[in-house]
Amino acid sequence: AIGLLCGLILSKIKNCKDIVIVEPNDKRLKESLKFLDADGFKPDSKNIINDQFGIVFDTVGLEVTRQQAIRCVKPGGIIIHIGLTQPSGDFDFRKTTLQEITIIGTYCYTNKDFEKTLSILNHREIGKLDWIEYRNLKEGSSAFKEIHNGTCSAPKIILLI
């Protein structure tokens, strides 16, 4: 959901064009593209080539997604690292140094950032939030299994008490 949210903000608030979203789950990818005017591919797609993008958001944070971000960012480009799934792994310092790639880690936000985000969501500046699915807390285990197994199409699930 963080990747979709980043894409929606870039598209609808920042008026960015040529957005590409990468998602391994075909169902989630198809569902996300209903809400975002973007190209969508699986991570192993031949459409994702090296040195292709000026800015890359890694919203997952696995070693494999970090490596893909480094491979596909253009020389002089920027990688914004948000995801925290895996704490460590291999890192191509040579490419990032020789090609002067900027890496920005982001985790926390200011109260002003939080207020702005709530305003964007409340005023539907990024469209309806129909991509969010709500389930009871007792369905949490099955929701995680569906996400893991690739059978869940919802980009975001919120568990309700």
Task: Enumerate the language-model features and the residues they cover.
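Mid-domain Rossmann-like dinucleotide-binding core that forms the NAD(H)/NADP(H) cofactor-binding site
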Residues: 1-43
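Short conserved AdoMet
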Residues: 14, 61, 74-75, 152
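N-terminal Rossmann-fold cofactor-binding loop
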Residues: 22-24, 59, 107
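Short acidic-hydrophobic, aromatic-tinged amphipathic segments that line or gate anion-handling sites
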Residues: 38-45, 134-139
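A short acidic, Gly/Pro-enriched loop at the edge of an enzyme's catalytic core
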Residues: 47-56
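Short, well-ordered coil/turn residues at beta-beta hairpins
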Residues: 57-59, 161
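Glycine-rich phosphate-binding loop and adjacent beta-alpha segment
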Residues: 64-123, 160-161
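C-terminal hydrophobic helical "lid"/dimerization subdomain
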Residues: 67, 111, 115-161
